[in-house]
Amino acid sequence: ITRNYTLFRYMLGCNAYGSVPTKFNGGLFTFDPCHIDEKQAFTPDYRKWGGGTMTAQNQRLVYWPMLKSGDFDMMPSQFNFYNRMLKNAELRSHVYWQHEGACFCEQIENFGLPNPAEYGFKRPAWFDKGLEYNAWLEYEWDTILEFCQMILETKNYAGADITPYLPLIESSLTFFDEHYRLLASRRGRKALDGDGHLILFPGSACETYKMTNNASSTIAALRTVLETYIKVCNNEKWQKMLETIPPVPLRYIEVKDSLNLQASTMTPAWKQTISPAKSWERINNIETPQLYPVFPWRIYGVGKENLEIARDTYFYDPDALKFRSHTGWKQDNIWAACLGLTEEAKSLSLAKLSDGPHRFPAFWGPGYDWTPDHNWGGSGMIGLQEMLLQTNGTQILLFPAWPKEWNVHFKLHAPGNTTVEATLKDGKVTNLKVSPESRKKDIVIMIEK
C-alpha cells in the first residue's frame, strides 16, 4: 500500500507545474490502447473520455490529496484552468439566462464551454440553450464548488495568497443564488420557499439522481464553501446567502432487525439517514451523493454532531450498498475512513491500493475511465490519508480509522501551517513530532487501546 501510494504521488509530480492540470484519464502516461481494450485500435495518444475535455467529478480526486501531502505548489494548474475560463462561464449565464454568475458544466472544454458531443448535436429547437441535452449531465453545475473549496483550503493549510481566485469563488456562488431565484420566479410569485430558502430545482445529485429538488450534495457544497469563504471575506452579502441555503435533507430507511423478533417475524427498525435529495425523478448512474456531506464537504465525520446519521447512511442506504465498490472513482474507502469505520476502511484501501494489472503497479484501471486511472489513485491516496489524520475544528485526530496492527510511519499536513509526523509500531504511538510545537496540544490520538 505504501509503495503504491508513493508511486502514484510520483506520477502526480511528473506534471507538477504544467500549464494544464494532470488529467484523470492517464496524466502524462499513455500507452497502446489495445492493452486496455482490444476494440480501441488507435495510437498511444488515445485516451478514453477525451484529451482536451475535463470531467470535474474525476479531476477533483486527482487534486484533493495534495492538501494533506503538502503538495500545494502543484495545485495552481488546476485552479488556473478554471480561472482562465471564468469569463466564458459568466457569458453562458448572461447569454442564456440574462443573470450574473459563472456556470461551469461538468464535462467542460478548456475554453469553458460544454463538450459539444455532451451538449448535443441534435437538440430540439425549444430546449434551454444553456443546458446540455444529456441525461447524465443536465443541471450538474455544482462540481466547480469543490475546486473553490480546494482554493480556500490552500489558504487554511499553507497561508496561500488566494486573491487571484476570489472572483472565481464569488461568481461560482452567485450563479446558484441568481439562477435558482430566477427559476423559482418563473414558476410562481416567490423566489424563495416558505422558510426563506433557495429552491434548488431542477438539480442533479452527481450524475445519478436527476431532476432533484434540493440535492444534498449541492446543499452541502454551498453551505461549506460559504461558511469557509465568510471566514476569509466577512461580507454581509455572503452571510445573507448562507441564510438562504436549505438544510441537508434527511429520510428514514426501514431496516429489518433480525435480533428483534416478535411473533416469529422480524420487526422493522427505522434509521435516519442523509437523503440524496428532497425528491428526484430517476436514477441515472452509480454514484452515492448522499455521502458527499461526509466527503468532500465534512459536515458529518469523526467528532462531529450526528455521526450516527452518516454511519447509518453508509450501512443502510440501499443505493449506497448497491453501488459500493473500490473501483475507479468510487469513494467508499474515503467515506469509511471519514466515519471512523476502521475495518471497512482497511478492506477497501487494501482493494483500492493493491497492485494494478500492469508491470508498473500504480497503473490502475481502466475502472470507469482509462488506464492509468488517476482518480483511482487519487481516491486511494485520500482514503489512506483520512485513515491516518483528520481534523475537527482545531483538533487534529490521529489514527481515526487506522488498524492498530498496521505499523506505519507518516508525515502529513494539517490546517494552520501544521505538519504531523508519527510512528505506530505494535499498537503504540512513538516519535510524534508536531510543527509548530504549539499545535501539539490539539493532537487527539484515537488508535484503539
Task: Please place each PLM-identified region on the residue numbering.
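Acidic/polar, glycine-enriched structural segments that form the non-catalytic walls/loops
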Residues: I1-G52, F72-P76, Y82-S93, K278-S279, ...
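Mature extracytoplasmic enzyme cores
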Residues: I1-L7, M11, H94-V95, N110-W126, ...
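Short, glycine/acidic-rich hinge or "gate" loops at secondary-structure transitions
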Residues: S19-T30, P164, L182-H197, K237
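Acidic/His metal-coordination segments adjacent to aromatic residues that form catalytic metal sites
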Residues: L28-W49, E109-L137, L198-A215, D355-W370
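Active-site core of glycosidic bond-cleaving carbohydrate-active enzymes
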Residues: T55-V62, L67-L91, H99-L113, G130-Y157, ...
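Acidic/histidine-rich catalytic neighborhood
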Residues: S171, F175-V232
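Catalytic cores of secreted or luminal carbohydrate-active enzymes
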Residues: T371-V420
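Carbohydrate-binding surface patches
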Residues: G416-D442
